[in-house]
């Protein structure tokens, strides 16, 4: 089982979870929002104040790729706790801004 399959299996109770392959790695969506990236078999969850409060000291800041914004790098042992990781992803989705719609170019 691949890392992305394992993570999506762990998030089975979270509605509207989807993945999209990007640049050889994966973006994890909850609804229309990108809530995390999976790069080099590691989960990087977008940082929100509410997510940081929930996680406490259970993460280190990491970068999914060179030039990326800092994210919460989640250790494998924390991924095993389905309820915990589902709650973190839900909190993250609830506290991220709505994605901006791309403006159509007028030619």
Summary of predicted features, one role per range:
Residues 1-107:
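Charge-dense, helix-prone N-terminal extensions
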């Amino acid at each position: 089982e691949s890392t992305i399959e394992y993570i999506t299996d762990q998030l089975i109770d979270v509605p509207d979870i989807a993945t999209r392959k990007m640049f050889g790695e994966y973006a994890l969506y909850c609804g229309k929002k990108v809530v995390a990236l999976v790069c080099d078999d590691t989960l990087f969850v977008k940082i929100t104040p509410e997510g940081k409060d929930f996680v406490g000291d259970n993460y280190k800041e990491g970068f999914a790729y060179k030039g990326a914004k800092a994210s919460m790098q989640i250790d494998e042992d924390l991924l095993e706790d389905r309820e915990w990781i589902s709650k973190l992803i839900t909190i993250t989705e609830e506290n991220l801004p709505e994605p901006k719609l791309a403006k159509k170019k007028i030619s």
